[in-house]
Amino acid sequence: SSDVCSSDLISEEITFKSKNNKRWQWVTGVSGFYQWLHTTGPVNFMEDGVTDMIEGNINNTFKKIHLDDPRRTPEMSLDVLNNRIRVSGSFDTPVFSTALYHQSTFNDLFVKGLSVTAGLRLEYEKMSMNYFSDSNIDFDFFLKMAMPPLNIPFRNLNAAPLLEGKEKNDYVQLLPKLAFKYDFSPANNMYVSITRGYRSGGYNVQMFSELIQSDMQQKMIEAILDKAPESMAGMIEGMIKQHMPNYGKELNVQETTVYKPEYSWNYEVGSHLSLFNGKLKTDLAAFYMDTHDQQIAKFVNSGLGRMMVNAGSSESYGVEASFLASINKNLNMNVSYGYTHSTFKKYDGGTTSSEEQIDYSGNYVPFVPRHTMNAGANYSFFFDKSNWMQSLTLGMSYTGAGKIYWTEKNNVSQSFYGTLNGRISLQTKALQIDVWGRNLTNKDYTTFYFETMHRGFEQKSRPLQLGVDIRYHF
């Protein structure tokens, strides 16, 4: 499959602000945008795909029908005549959004240095999807009975699945913000904030390959029933309804393709510090995030594309700390660390093919590193202005992340890993030359992992890299 997207956007924002250096600082505004987005996303089934995914799936169902009661049910099979099948896909998904917002900050409230910020944003979002997807398939159908001996071929049947229509959704959000900050010196403060976050919903256009396959199966069965004698058609339809519960039901495009907005309440407490006459700058923070209707990206069951789903709710909490030290004119060092504990509070994953309930509640949210860290140092040599070389800087850094879970099941993960990087930078009046190396220890780790069609695929890290950057200023 291949997607081709074209997009146009028009936006406008009008803002009114108070003058600076006032005890009451405020900002009020209105904003809006309209985005046109057209996606052409056809899916092409080549010969193996036709055999395995279209012909194979429905023949497996026919085989199961026969094996459940081989003495009373006939053997049924079909043979797709097309070597290739193309499923078209054309989707227009425009989005309109407008917002009205206000934020006020009251400085030196009650005591000098204490400020309170309160804000509110009212947002309206309207989205729609015009969709068109069709296909065409030619096939033969075979029915074989043991008693009485009977072998009937239905040849040159045709099915033409078609999905065409429009979906519309709109959402209203009220997003408040409240923050307290205390400046106990011009360069040092501590703060507490509470905000409500929002992430837009949308449409899973790649799900249409699933929908069109379901409609294709229905149309193929309808073609068989139209060709079969009336007495035999009733028998075939009864067996199919018994083993294919969704047969005859209207496809629910809205339920299958729409994913809802994600909401979160975010709580943070922290401090910004400048110590030892500015030689040491420190940022400290602790946070808690309560997320509902969490959006999780996953592959569709057939493996033909990815979709976004609302998994349920999750909670995340952690700490972050960063330190930047200017030891002297030549040497500076930095260290940062973050810890995040992010788990699902509720995750209804639906049911398996054997109708078993899937529940990932309590599991770690995938793609969220438990630990992140960075440490680095730079030492610079400065030369006389008359020298052709102005400075030479030597830098080293170490970056790490992990443990990272790749699946909602938490059965595949990447343990903590770190990479060592270095850089030598030569600066002249007009020329800068950087010689750099990344992953100097040639560390092997996984940067991305996903599962589709019952197989796992991983993207490995880049090996040791060396390079030179040259910049000329004129």
Outline where the language-model segments fall.
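Repeated loop/turn-to-beta-strand initiation elements of outer-membrane beta-barrel proteins
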Residues: 23-26, 111-116, 187-190, 277-282, ...
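Signature of Gram-negative outer-membrane beta-barrel scaffolds
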Residues: 27-186, 203, 215, 222-226, ...
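C-terminal beta-signal and adjacent terminal beta-strands/loops
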Residues: 37, 43, 50, 198, ...
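Transmembrane beta-barrel strands of outer-membrane/channel proteins
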Residues: 28-34, 118-124, 192-196, 271, ...
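Short, small-residue-biased leader/transition segments that mark boundaries at the very start
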Residues: 3-6
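Gram-negative outer-membrane beta-barrel transporters
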Residues: 110, 279-292, 307-407, 471-473
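Membrane-embedded beta-barrel scaffold of Gram-negative outer-membrane proteins
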Residues: 189-191, 212-309, 315-317, 338
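Residue-level signature of outer-membrane beta-barrel architecture
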Residues: 16-19, 102-108, 172, 180-184, ...
